[in-house]
Amino acid sequence: MSRKKGNAADLAPSRKEKKGIGQYILGFFLLLYTLFCFLPVLLVFIAAFSDEKAILENGFSFWPEKWSLVGINSVLKYGDQLVASYAVTIFVTVFGTFLGLLVMAMFAYSISRRDFRLSRFLSIYLLIPMLFNGGQLSGYIIFTSYYHMKDSLWLLILPLCVTTMNVIILRTYIANSIPNELMEAAKIDGAGEYRTFFQITLPLLKPSMAAVGFMMATAYWNDWQNALLYITSDSKKPLQLLLVSIQKSIEFLLNNTNVPAAARAAMGGNIPQYSSTMATVLVVIGPIMVVYPFFQKYFIKGLTVGSVKG
């Protein structure tokens, strides 16, 4: 017995130390790919702090001839409105993601139960929006004329709250990764459906919910079309719609030949078309880039674990 243990101990270090040349080659190409993906983000950051005249004369560069804060200031000058839009976007993103995850998790749980009579009907009902779409006009008429929800934050939350693909991801995870015997045991112990869902299924569903939640949060964060259709108050204007307004105001200045000389001098002699565009991109992607690394492992695990039946 001791000899067998000794042989196993001798083999263990050799397995750890052995690394084929293929792993080094793979690591090298992955490093190159990482740099390839990071360089555009770096260029956006540099261009946001570049002088507009230098961009017009020499194009975008990783080391511009002249640095300038005109582009970023053209966005930050909206101070109070920018803070209010950030607050609206964060609220819509957090609350919409939480509400959507709760509703979709309950929906996915119900259609994953084999003993639920309406499981097949609801599964077919779930697929209808993927095949048929009423379009924006019908949705606009229903929300504004019948529900009277014009200029309401609910119209930034409800349209993206439930999506077919996210429900399918959650349902697949429940069916493939959570043993049905666990739910049957809870039922035998006297647990109802709500208790089984909240105390057993929901805690085990966290990896998949993290993946779906990140995709939902990204969709809410980048949504500007619903705000453009339904929001009219400045106090309810989300970040994306504000940035669209900033870009339109810059385009107006570019197309207006009667811009005062003092205004042009304040902008460095040139209207910051490209630098301000990069500054708006930086304002948008900054928070997502900060948050994503913390959810990356859950995002990958949630998409892969439920895809293979164990």
Cite the ranges covered by each PLM segment.
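A hydrophobic, multi-pass inner-membrane permease signature
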Residues: S2-G310
